[in-house]
Amino acid sequence: MNYPAVAKELLTLLGGKSNITALAHCATRLRLAVADEQKIDEQAIDNLEGVKGQFKVAGQYQIIFGSGIVNQVYAEMAKLTGMSEMSTNDVASAGAEKQNIVQPAVKGLSDIFVPIIPAIVAGGLLMGIYNLLTAQGLFIDGKSLIEANPGLTDLANMINTFANAPFVYLPILLAFSASKKFGGNPYLGAALGMLMVHPDLLNGWGFGGASVSGNIPVWNILGFEIQKVGYQGSVLPVLVSAFILAKVELGLRKVIPSVLDNLLTPLLAIFIAGLLTFTVVGPFTRDIGFLLGDGLNWLYNTAGFVGGAVFGLIYAPFVITGMHHSFIAIETQLLADIATTGGTFIFPIAAMSNVSQGAAALAVGVMSKDKKMKGIAIPSGVTGLLGITEPAMFGVNLKLRYPFIAAVCAAALSSAFITMFNVKAQALGAAGLPGIISITPDKIGYYIAGMVIAFLTAFVLTIVLGIGDRAKVGKKAAA
C-alpha cells in the first residue's frame, strides 16, 4: 500500500486540512474531529484502499484500517496536518464540543445501563417465562399451565422471584453504576440504592393504591413529615440521587482533613444524599410523573387517535426516566371503575411501545455483523416483545439512536390504530405479546393487528434507517 498516497487522498475526501480539528489513532482506527461533517465524502472513503469501515460516535469520526495499517496512515496524515502530538483524549474532547446537549446525555445513560444489562435481560426473560406459565387461556382454554398442572405452581413462583429480583433492586444496580459514572464511590452508590428499596419503606409499586386510600406512611421529624416510600423499579430518582451523592462526596473530600476523610465523608455523603432523596428528589420526580400522567389522560380522552399517537410516541421516553410507574395510579382508578371506563387505555399503548422497541432491537440483531452487538440485541429484542424494554432501549436502541427513533414512530402509528378502535385492557399483566389475555375480548383482534403494525413498522424502519450506516450497527458497541 502506498501510505502517503492513501493519506493524501483521504485528507481530500475529509474536506481538506482546514476541516480537521483533531487527529489521533487507537489500535485499529483513525480517530478524527472535523469542523464540518457535510464536507466528508463517506462513499468515496468506503472505497479507499485499506478502509474496512467508518462510523461516527460521540462527535468523533472514526475510520477503521486495522492493526498495523492505521499506524502508517496516521503517520502520513500527521505530516500533512501537523497534528502529531494529539491523543485519543484530545480527539474525544474536540468531538464532545460538537455534540448537542442530547448526545452526551444519551451516551451517559448508555454508559450507566450497559454494565447492568445482563441482570435486566435475565430478569426479563424469566418474567416472560413466568407470564407464559400463568397466562390464562394462552395455551389451554380458560386455564393457565399451572392451573392445568398444579405441580408447576411452586416452580412458577420460584421463577417469579428470580425474575423480579433485578427490577425490585434495580436502584442498587443503577446507583452503583451511576455513581461510578459520575466520579463517586460506587459502593456508596450501592448503599444509597439499598436505602431507596429498604423493606421498612412502602413498596414503590404500592404508592398508587396508598395515595388513593390516603394511607401513605411518613416520618414525623419535629412536625415535618417525610413520606416513607421506596423507589423499586425507578430510574430518574436514582440517577438524580446518585449524581447528588457523587458530587457531595467529591466536595467533602476536598474540605475534610485526610485523617477524618474515611470516617466523615461516607457518613455525611449518605446522610445528605439520602435526606435530599426522600425530601426533594423522590417526591419531585414522582409528582412530575403524576402530572404527566394526568395530562396524557386528558389527551387520550379529548384528542382521539391523535392523542393515542402522541402517547405512543412519548411512552418510551417516560420509561427511560421511570415515570411510567406513575401511570399505575391512573390505571388502578380506571380499572376500579371499569363499568364506567371500560378498562385502561394505558396498558395497550404501553404494549405497542414495548413491541416496537423489541422489534427495533431484533432488527439490529439481524443487521449486525458484530457478535457482541448481536448477542445483546437478539435477547433484548425478545424481552421487549415480552414486555420488558429496558435491555433493548438502553443496550441497543438508544445507543445507536436510529432504532429508538424507528421504535417510537412505530409506537405512535400502532397506538393511533388501536385508539381508533378504543382498545382497552380489563386487567394488568405483561405489556407485550402475553398481554393479549388482558385485553377486553371483543378488542383482541385489533390488539393483535396493532402489535403486527408495531412490529413490522419498527423492524422495517430500523433496517431502512440503518442501511446507510451499517458500520455503526456492527462496530459502535466496541467504540
Curated annotation (Swiss-Prot):
SUPFAM superfamilies: Glucose permease domain IIB. The chain crosses the membrane at residues 112-132, 158-178, 182-202, 204-224, 232-252, 264-284, 303-323, 345-365, 376-396, 403-423, 448-468. Its main location: membrane. It is an enzyme of class 2 (transferase). It is found in: Cell inner membrane. GO terms for molecular function: kinase activity; protein-N(PI)-phosphohistidine-sucrose phosphotransferase system transporter activity; protein-phosphocysteine-trehalose phosphotransferase system transporter activity. Residues 120-477 form the PTS EIIC type-1 domain. Its EC number is 2.7.1.211. GO terms for cellular component: plasma membrane. The active site is at C26 (phosphocysteine intermediate). The keyword Transferase applies. Keywords: Cell inner membrane, Cell membrane, Kinase, Membrane, Phosphotransferase system, Sugar transport, Transferase, Transmembrane, Transmembrane helix, Transport. The PTS EIIB type-1 domain is phosphorylated by phospho-EIIA on a cysteinyl residue. Then, it transfers the phosphoryl group to the sugar substrate concomitantly with the sugar uptake processed by the PTS EIIC type-1 domain. The phosphoenolpyruvate-dependent sugar phosphotransferase system (sugar PTS), a major carbohydrate active transport system, catalyzes the phosphorylation of incoming sugar substrates concomitantly with their translocation across the cell membrane. This system is involved in sucrose transport. This is PTS system sucrose-specific EIIBC component. It comes from Vibrio alginolyticus. The lineage of its organism: Bacteria, Pseudomonadati, Pseudomonadota, Gammaproteobacteria, Vibrionales.
